Amino acid sequence: GVVAWTGENAETFVGLYLSQFPVGTIPAKLTFKAAADSNSVWMIVSGTFGERRLNLRRPETLPYIVANKDWVPVEYNGNTTAGSPLDFSVYLDAPAGKYGPVIINRDGHFSFRDAPGKRIRFFGPNLVGTANYLDKALADDFVTKATRLGYNTVRFHHFDNGLIDPNASDSLTFDPKALDQFDYLFAELKKHGIYSCLDLYASRELKPGDNIKELEGRSSPEKFILKRLIPISESAMDNWKEFARRLLTHRNPYTGLTYAEDPALYALNLVNENPLVITWQGWDPALIPLFEERYVEYLKEKGLDTPENRASRGGLFIEFLNDLQIRSIEEQKRFLKDELKLTALVTDLNMTSKFTLNSAREHLDFVDNHQYWDHPMFPVAAWQM
């Protein structure tokens, strides 16, 4: 057999073998015994019968390092000693934004407006939910640890709900305390050479005072419903614009700049994980007729209105969804760059690798796409420092 899984328990290194045994006809009973000279603890996790032989290729033996005179276990707690070999803050070029806004240079790399030959690659974490809103002491501690890890970017993610005044009738009124915490953290990151990016919509929960036409009379709309509504609803688009306006034209008292003009904000994602080819059906079927009505209008404009095409959810329908998405992206970009004078790069459609999204992604400054490995799980306090 081959080692199919490895891990550790409190005492030692453990593994599971994937083995196969020819048995001929289906037996009434099978007995397995450990080798006589084995001092291991053996168990059978599962078994199955099959007619096909497995191709069990034996991979190269992976090294397993144990504590000894040459290897000492290190428990990481973030408190890297300043100036030590593990302090990577020396590689940061502070403050963030010193070379002007980040641009895409002629070779397709991240660079700077005032130093186009100087490349930068971004490496850093997401801050999610309440992790975006820290008191000043904790913010200082986080920034110190982040710089010593060599991080040069932080993504403010799912920050939108925490920024909203819980007592307001809409989801557009900011909470002054939360805004101050956001401003301070951004400014400290900037001061130490860490660039920021954010999503203008991730999970902001709508309220009755938002006056979204398509949601009138509905008490509890789907949590992420704005993702689907923005491309087809004028009032939803206006709501997105107003949130963006209030955030990006706000002058951070710790930097003296608005977010729209601050080069330390190097990128904005319009709407988090929103490709209509994935989201148009959503969890709430109530919006599906809105897309179907728009699809019929699209077919009529193209001279393709037939019963077969109306029923299709294949290529024509995907082209229709991409057309909606492109129109939405272009309007959002126009608003940000022409009206708000945004200097940051703009991206969107940051989920899935479907080739059908290529035509829409051509309308972005750069492509941001998400892949997940070992996604965090929390036994106690989710997404908190």
Which stretches of residues belong to each language-model region?
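Active-site mouth of glycoside hydrolases
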Residues: 42, 99-109, 113-377
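Mature N-terminal, pre-catalytic/accessory segment of carbohydrate-active enzymes
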Residues: 1-126, 132-137, 141-145, 149-152
